[in-house]
């Protein structure tokens, strides 16, 4: 028996998304699973087997305890050295591609090829695909550590999970990324790749203790990519009541400026989420009609912050009734970033500066006053799939009390 999200006292895996709750409205996941297709897992090998079983058949997977991703087929821990190709070592890589001698040419050659093979070795263990008609629910304090769940199917629900520290042992140096080059890594905690009808609800996303401060070539040796990315023609997604925190690149909706797979898709609802100590991409959008409402943004300091709303190519962000708490040193115009987009709807925003009282802020006007070219206000659509729109003044209390795992089942 499938029941709507508002229902209480029912088996968590049978809960479905309500008929008006964002772009993924009506998503059922594995709610129709037969009893034989309901499994509880506590190891990576068990999770992989449960997700791969009976492709397309409705299934419910309950996660108990902490599942480690960096393990072998028998769930024994593996280190970065265990994944490394025999021809790869970090000291040799640093010596080969030092910008002082290598310059601005894209990295290539045997050492880069060995790094790529090393990365593929790790990916074979830490990336698990989630197919169609699947519900994955955490029990208690369930955690996925060092794992990437990659949703590639239709009709998927992921709830009550802690996604932590999906890290890349083998970042790549890109001398052309920015003025000084950058280290780039693979692996998001949760990846939606060509996925449709997906509900991501009451989860926690972060880096755990792996905050990383090592630098090479004067740039942070970045072992993390995104927390939650929605890319490659994914569509009809609702992201609700999650905590996303202590991370740089947070939520990317659309990964390329090319329209090949994304035009007319990437329709996403982002509501009642808490973004705390986030550097950027909350979210950054290309192409999609994205409804961003009733979210709580906490920016504790300026040094690690870049922006919150990224206005990308052909994006159509409709932001309303969001609440920001920011430091006094952060200009209001910095909350929005231009990424080749042209329009932004932003109404009902409240901003509290420091410990001050919140006040209404016109995000679009603040951005336009500080930047050229101006963004226009007409995004060409109005959201209708909204079960409840809270006034921004109520957002801090509601989201603080309700977002994240352990609060999903009332």
Predicted segment positions?
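Extracellular beta-rich repeat passengers
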Residues: 284-410
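Helix-rich interaction surfaces within compact, conserved domain-sized segments
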Residues: 60, 192-193, 198, 311, ...
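Right-handed parallel beta-helix
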Residues: 132-140, 154-167, 188, 194-211, ...
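Acidic glycine-/aspartate-rich tracts in secreted/extracellular proteins
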Residues: 45, 66-69, 141, 329
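Short, flexible helix-coil linker/hinge segments at the edges of structured domains or between repeats
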Residues: 172-183, 209-223
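Extracellular beta-strand-rich solenoid/capping regions of secreted or surface-exposed proteins
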Residues: 49-56, 71-135, 143-159, 165-176, ...
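Secretory targeting and sorting signals
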Residues: 1-9
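Acidic Gly/Asp/Thr-rich repetitive segments characteristic of extracellular carbohydrate-active
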Residues: 19-62
């Amino acid at each position: 028996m499938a029941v709507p999200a508002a229902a209480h006292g029912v088996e968590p895996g049978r809960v479905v998304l309500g008929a008006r709750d964002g772009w993924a409205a009506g998503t059922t996941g594995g709610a129709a699973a037969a009893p034989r297709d309901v499994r509880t897992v506590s190891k990576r090998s068990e999770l992989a087997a449960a997700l791969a079983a009976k492709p397309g058949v409705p299934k419910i997977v309950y996660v108990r305890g902490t599942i480690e991703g960096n393990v072998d087929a028998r769930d024994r821990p593996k280190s970065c050295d265990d994944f490394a190709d025999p021809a790869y070592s970090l000291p040799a890589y640093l010596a080969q591609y030092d910008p002082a001698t290598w310059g601005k040419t894209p990295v290539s050659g045997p050492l880069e090829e060995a790094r790529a093979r090393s990365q593929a070795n790790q990916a074979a263990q830490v990336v698990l695909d989630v197919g169609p008609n699947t519900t994955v629910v955490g029990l208690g304090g369930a955690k996925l550590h060092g794992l990437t769940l990659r949703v590639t199917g239709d009709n998927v629900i992921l709830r009550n999970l802690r996604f932590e520290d999906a890290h890349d042992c083998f970042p790549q140096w890109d001398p052309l990324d920015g003025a000084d080059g950058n280290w780039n890594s693979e692996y998001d905690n949760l990846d939606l790749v060509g996925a449709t009808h997906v509900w991501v609800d009451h989860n926690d996303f972060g880096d755990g203790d792996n905050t990383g401060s090592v630098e090479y070539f004067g740039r942070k040796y970045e072992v993390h990519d995104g927390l939650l990315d929605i890319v490659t023609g994914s569509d009809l997604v609702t992201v609700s009541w999650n905590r996303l925190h202590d991370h740089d690149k947070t939520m990317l909706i659309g990964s390329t400026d090319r329209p090949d797979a994304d035009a007319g898709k990437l329709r996403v609802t982002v509501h009642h989420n808490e973004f705390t100590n986030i550097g950027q991409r909350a979210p950054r959008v290309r192409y999609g009609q994205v409804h961003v409402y009733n979210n709580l943004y906490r920016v504790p300091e300026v040094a690690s912050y870049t922006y919150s709303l990224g206005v990308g190519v052909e994006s159509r962000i409709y932001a309303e009734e969001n609440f920001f708490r920011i430091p006094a040193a952060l200009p209001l115009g910095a909350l929005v970033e231009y990424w080749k987009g042209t329009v932004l709807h932003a109404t009902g925003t409240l901003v509290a500066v420091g410990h001050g009282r919140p006040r209404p802020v016109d995000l679009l006007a603040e951005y336009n006053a500080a930047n050229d070219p101006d963004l226009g206000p007409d995004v060409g659509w109005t959201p209708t799939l909204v079960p409840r729109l809270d006034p921004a003044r109520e957002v801090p209390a509601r989201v603080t009390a309700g977002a994240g795992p352990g609060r999903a089942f009332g």
